[in-house]
């Protein structure tokens, strides 16, 4: 049951309530998602009212991996309205402390994400940075344990996912994870090149989720 969080690993009622609210409120523009319909606008500001987020099964996996590795510093690109940030921040809190460094370009979504984190009781575990991730994520402040790269499909190369993984790769510690939701070809090319220090696998979550581990 892809959209059902009742059987997931999160037990905190406030956190679950926020996630369930975001799932129930999820909607797709009448013109379709820009990742599926290349003919529609790809300007992220045209979608300020829409939260393009991970699905709960992806979030459950993200949470479990962060708990298992005792992650304390994670990166969330792009934060959108905060669904993935809530999963990350819950793991940071339950690990005993840590920080989610989020990046979101659209100011309205930054405000919404911060509000959702506060509603979940997790605001103290998140630093949501407003602006272009190519600048906001240039310094994560220390070794990164986990990075979600779920950025905007700009329809060109290099994709934002490729640019962001190139920025983050030197900051991700050996043994750290990267999850990607959109399977941008040039992102996959980067993480599947052994010279870049990653190994990866495509998981049958959503329409295909790439999970990568930095091994060198």
Where do the language-model regions lie?
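Active-site residues of response regulator receiver
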Residues: 150
